[in-house]
């Protein structure tokens, strides 16, 4: 029995080792930048990593300017990710959510997707239970932005 357990454990370790990327290719939070490279509406997406002198790290994708990960030290100094995010661009594209979105036409809901401006009633698309949420189904959080990593602390 011990022999089978040891063989199974060894096999599991070998399989795990075969699938791991070198640590230098991953972000501090364990994200693989290659999993954020795709094309959306003829524009290239990517993952950008910012770091400060204190060791904090922020990962942002140019797909909607979404914050994917923020690594900060906990009370014991251990780095922890404080963002609820996905580990690939595919999930941000295919799972209906606004996770990490830092940009949009507006925040929250417009009741029944309708408002009055200068006496005219404006009807917006209803994308959330009869209401218009965060700019509608094609809000700015779904656009791909041009980005340029100037240095480890500056993204433009």
Residue ranges and their predicted role:
Residues 15-17:
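C-terminal motif of bacterial Sec signal peptides marking the signal peptidase cleavage site
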Residues 19-156:
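Surface-exposed acidic/polar loop and edge beta-strand patches at domain peripheries
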Residues 5-13:
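Sec-dependent N-terminal signal peptides
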Residues 4-5, 23:
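Small/flexible residues
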